[in-house]
């Protein structure tokens, strides 16, 4: 055979071998590529599935009904025009002219501060202020001025008709031109005024706490239900975006079984500890001290409970009929008028938990604490911790409070599979030992050190706050909510819901049943502290019983 023929014969064989080798090599390469594509596709699909699992629906506050501008104008009376009374009337659309002046100047100096703009764009509730009642003349006159500020004007504005001042709240309740009342008096008057308002057929917006004594708690509930009036309890957190999102997270079981919840109060400011300034015009002539002392029946209930249980050390020490400006302006510091940390601040935390999880009244409460920082003669503790047990839910809720440290702590819901922290924002992190998400954690689809869900409503629109109290509520998401991208004061939304239920029917989101559950819970915590023993709830008899 010639060399030429040999070459021609060998080349195809060589090419065949090279081709075979290429084929043999290319098979696993293509297979690896295909497998890689498959794995990537599967990973992406699992990521999407996880995303779908944790996707939350848009939230709408209960108040997000259309205002009825052509409906009946609701005629309002306000009882109590202290710190919270001012805030409530302002939220309803009737601000003090001096506040409008301040907001306008703030907006001029700081264009990013939108508080004045938001307030002026707030829809009218179609209400009028017909009557005001406060036992301090200066506050009563300020309430009249605010109630006549129908156009939200500054000090140089044109005002409307002045509401009538009533020196006794029962006279206001008897007025034919008042449909509904906002009650923002001191704690020891809440129950009595709410009962009388309901029996007078007036719709009620009641500030917390619902009651000062345990016996009146039942009377309030019965009076509201029997009268059929529209009752809204004060918790504007019912309108808060992050709380509504948190409720969805619980309903979707994203956290798994929740066995422990921690809630707290942290303040570090005299104002936050109820050491309020004493007004320069306050004296025995401008204050009706006799009315301030309280309703005789309620006072008898209070004194009877204290005496029967050996708690006389918590009464006084000043005589109840002795005029005292400190006790008038700083009444929260004494059990003689106050419900303490449980009635004033635990109530917000408990209502948030009850709104989100529907826990109801706890089975038991155990408390401890004391007056550890503010040695100013107060009888109400400035440090308190209470453990509430819900055995039917396999759940404990811990409340801890100090008025001498502002270390920020949110509400923490601890589940087997994930934990949720809730304040002005919401964060969910998966537990590294989660059973439900173990496979996704192993695959790197879920990373325990990275938030699974983060929700920050209106993050870019945060204005300065003007007091320790406002800062406290801002940190808890209780100042603003967002409806269709527009920022609203949550108290405005809460009053708006109440007004629309009066006008068109319906039950407000924080109704008498929610208020009753909260009142009993707070009383259990308070009695546990005062008596130094665990308190239990007999749900069949509806009674607080001692351990």
Residue ranges and their predicted role:
Residues 77-79, 130-134, 182-183, 205-206, ...:
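Structural recognition of the beta-strand scaffold that forms the well-ordered cores
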Residues 165, 190, 239-242, 491:
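Conserved donor sugar-nucleotide recognition element shared by glycan-biosynthetic enzymes
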Residues 192, 212-215, 219, 490-497:
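Generic alpha-helical secondary structure signal
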């Amino acid at each position: 055979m010639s060399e030429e023929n040999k070459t021609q014969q060998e080349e195809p064989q060589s090419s065949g071998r090279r081709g075979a080798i290429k084929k043999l090599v290319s098979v696993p390469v293509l297979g690896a590529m295909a497998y890689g594509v498959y794995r990537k596709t599967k990973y992406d699909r699992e990521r999407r599935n996880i995303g779908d699992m944790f996707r939350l629906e848009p939230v709408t506050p209960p108040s997000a009904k259309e205002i009825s501008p052509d409906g009946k104008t609701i005629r309002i009376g306000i009882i109590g025009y202290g710190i919270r009374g001012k805030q409530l009337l302002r939220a309803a659309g009737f601000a003090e002219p001096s506040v409008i002046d301040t907001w306008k100047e703030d907006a001029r100096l700081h264009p990013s501060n939108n508080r004045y703009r938001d307030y002026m764009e707030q829809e009218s509730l179609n209400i009028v202020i017909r009557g005001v009642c406060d036992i301090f003349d200066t506050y009563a006159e300020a309430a009249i001025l605010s109630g006549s500020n129908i156009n939200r004007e500054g000090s140089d504005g044109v005002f409307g008709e002045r509401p009538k001042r009533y020196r006794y709240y029962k006279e206001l309740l008897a007025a034919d031109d008042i449909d509904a009342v906002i009650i923002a008096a001191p704690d020891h008057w809440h129950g009595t005024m709410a009962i009388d308002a309901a029996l007078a057929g007036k719709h009620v917006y009641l500030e917390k706490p619902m009651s000062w004594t345990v016996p009146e708690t039942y009377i309030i509930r019965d009076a509201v239900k029997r009268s059929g009036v529209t009752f809204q309890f004060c918790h504007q957190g019912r309108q808060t975006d992050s709380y509504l999102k948190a409720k969805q997270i619980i309903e979707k079981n994203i956290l798994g079984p929740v066995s422990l919840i921690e809630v707290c109060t942290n303040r570090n400011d005299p104002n936050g500890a109820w050491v309020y300034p004493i007004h320069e015009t306050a004296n025995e002539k401008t204050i009706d001290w006799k009315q301030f002392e309280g309703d005789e029946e309620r006072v008898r209930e209070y004194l009877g409970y204290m005496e029967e249980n050996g708690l006389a050390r918590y009464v006084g020490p000043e005589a109840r009929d002795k005029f005292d400006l400190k006790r008038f302006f700083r009444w929260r510091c004494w059990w003689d008028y106050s419900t303490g940390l449980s009635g004033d601040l635990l109530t917000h935390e408990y209502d948030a938990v009850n709104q989100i999880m529907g826990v109801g009244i706890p089975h038991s409460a155990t408390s401890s604490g004391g007056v550890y920082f503010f040695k100013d003669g107060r009888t109400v503790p400035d440090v308190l911790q209470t453990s509430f047990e819900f055995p039917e839910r396999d759940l404990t809720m811990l409340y801890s409070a100090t008025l001498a440290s502002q270390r920020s702590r949110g509400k923490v819901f601890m589940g087997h599979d994930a934990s949720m922290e809730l304040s002005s924002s919401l964060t969910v992190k998966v537990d590294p030992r989660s059973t439900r998400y173990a496979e996704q954690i192993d695959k790197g689809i879920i990373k325990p050190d990275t938030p699974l869900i983060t929700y920050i409503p209106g993050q870019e629109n945060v204005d300065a706050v003007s007091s320790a109290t406002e800062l406290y509520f801002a940190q808890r998401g209780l100042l603003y909510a967002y409806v269709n991208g527009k920022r609203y004061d949550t108290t405005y939304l809460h009053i708006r819901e109440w007004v629309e239920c009066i006008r068109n029917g319906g039950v407000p989101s924080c109704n008498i049943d929610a208020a009753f559950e909260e009142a009993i819970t707070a009383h259990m915590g308070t009695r546990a502290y005062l008596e130094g023993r665990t308190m239990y709830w007999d749900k069949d008899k509806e009674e607080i019983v001692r351990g």
